[in-house]
Design a protein with these regions (language model features):
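Generic hydrophobic, aliphatic-rich segments that mediate packing or membrane embedding
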Residues: 123, 127, 154, 164-165
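Phosphate-binding P-loop
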Residues: 146-153
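Glycine-rich phosphate-binding P-loop
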Residues: 157-179
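Short beta-strand-centered segment that lines the nucleotide-binding/catalytic pocket of NTP-utilizing
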Residues: 180-188
Length: 250
């Protein structure tokens, strides 16, 4: 037994070293080229290039057919996980169809999305975080029902097809300096129930910034198309994520 434990420890150490090396490399074909003047031309966005450590994770999970066991995507598991993380058990008011929306979304993910293991992991974590925030928003409204009576004065609504400049227009409006133009930060759209200042705000901002860093690791040039930081302005569409029936899930 001691010999086995020592061998397992050695193997684990070697795997850790290998993964550390692989994490510095990227697998797959080049997805972009850079010209001499620094301009970036994206060439293979349909077949993106990922860190080798991600490719290795996908291969490992797929080879051993462990995806359903390691990364469950069922409503009971997700709700229980979100409840355990928050200590809350109420996710919506009576008559709110959020649960049927969640069920339909999960069925669609399993039947249509054809996710890799890392894609399934990210979807699972996003769903859990979404449910956590849904529970926190529900609690906040129960404690402060006056929130629902705050009038929305002349909201500015931007609509358009993807890649037509809607984000740029939104960001431009946030820079206007006009006192009547309010906006949310990326951190606020992901964690709307968090306090606007103090330790809770700092924790929320840190968590969101860590998520931004992870996205940068996964997709190093994403910021060239869409700059994202925890405290930068962001479209409010992520507020709809908690309905499980909004644009970010499509």
């Amino acid at each position: 037994m001691p010999a086995c434990i020592s061998l397992c420890a050695i193997i684990s150490a070697l795997v850790a070293i290998l993964l550390a090396i692989m994490s510095q490399r990227r697998c797959g074909g080049s997805e972009y080229t850079t010209t001499q003047d620094g301009r970036i031309s994206f060439t293979q966005l349909s077949h993106p290039e990922y860190p080798c450590i991600i490719a290795g994770f996908n291969t490992l999970i797929t080879s051993f057919n462990m995806i359903d066991w390691l990364l469950p995507l069922n409503e009971e598991y997700l709700i229980a996980k979100a409840s355990a993380n928050t200590g809350l058990a109420i996710f919506g008011r009576e008559g709110d169809p959020w649960r049927s929306h969640l069920r339909q979304l999960l069925n669609a993910i399993k039947a249509e999305a054809d996710l890799s293991p890392i894609g399934r992991f990210m979807s699972q974590q996003q769903l859990i975080k979404s449910l956590e925030q849904r529970a926190r928003v529900t609690q906040l409204i129960d404690e402060r029902p006056d929130i629902l009576r705050v009038p929305l004065l002349r909201p500015l609504i931007i609509t358009g097809m993807p890649r037509t400049g809607t984000t740029l227009l939104h960001n431009l409006l946030t820079l206007s300096g006009h006192p009547g133009v309010q906006h949310l930060t990326y951190a606020a759209t992901l964690q709307p129930a968090a306090a606007a200042s103090g330790p809770e705000h700092k924790l929320a901002r840190t968590e969101v910034q860590q998520a931004v860093i992870f996205m940068g690791f996964m997709r190093p040039l994403f910021s060239a198309m869409h700059e994202m930081e925890a405290e930068l302005p962001h479209e409010e569409l992520h507020l709809q994520v908690r309905s499980a029936a909004a644009n970010p899930w499509t």
